[in-house]
């Protein structure tokens, strides 16, 4: 129920906010940020890694196996007296602030629609409950994507910060020249979308896991625990189809959104990030060919919502409210099913009610 309250309150609140200055914008949306932190920070036994992180946050100086920035920040918080459950709040606050700051820099205008899609379509919000390191890295990667449009130095620096929270983020350096790569790979967006969705259905889990493990150096396997992941993901491959279908069901909305490329209503920057959103969704689907490499899809969760966002914004501006309603309902119905079923990261379990 708390997830739904957050969704309704935050979307209504954000829909009233307009501010050009990023700092003042963050001040104005403080109630939304605080609610985000209360929910994510107050999780209790949500996700299979909850206990592992709780133990680490309680004794961070005993562990050195995590990435340097993550370990350093956790140790710093510990030395300040923020231990155990308290550190979940820190990472929730970091994620909330920088997601909104990066999105403001991107030029998001309709914050109610954007936040609705961020929660219901990207899956980022609830996945913070489990993949703490990778989700924090994903926030800095998203920010890097936005900065790369105007400053390669800022973008690359943010990629390096992301790598300090999760080593896998370094692969996103491949998008340093985001404009050229996006235009090249999205020249035929409809073909890209359909092909990536078909690719995700290819059954290649076990063999691909083995190939990846063989290619990675022993040091990387030890630091990232990918060898352990490979064994786990192969064992759970039988449940994969349901997860894939929950993503592939969004394909019609992406195909529908392509009409915006012909209307001339998008600015050059919006069109670039619209196309990058198409590419992000395509990669998000294509990486589902294997659950192990599917972990890299987290870096495209947030930008993948942009085509649907631009579509909804266009419908809103044209006062096509009925069409907008049906698009939002279709985009979010999987999310509401997960929330009401209370599965995995959508489990409603918080320390406040224990």
PLM feature segments, named:
Residues 46, 51-55, 64-71, 176-294, ...:
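Alpha-helical transmembrane segments and terminal signal-anchor/GPI-anchor hydrophobic tails
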Residues 90-106:
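Transmembrane-helix motifs of polytopic, lipid-linked glycan transferases
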Residues 103-120:
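Transmembrane-helix signature of polytopic, membrane-embedded enzymes
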Residues 128-134:
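Short acidic/glycine- and proline-prone juxtamembrane loop motifs at membrane-interface regions
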Residues 190-197, 316-336:
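Signature aromatic-anchored transmembrane alpha helix within multi-pass, membrane-resident enzymes
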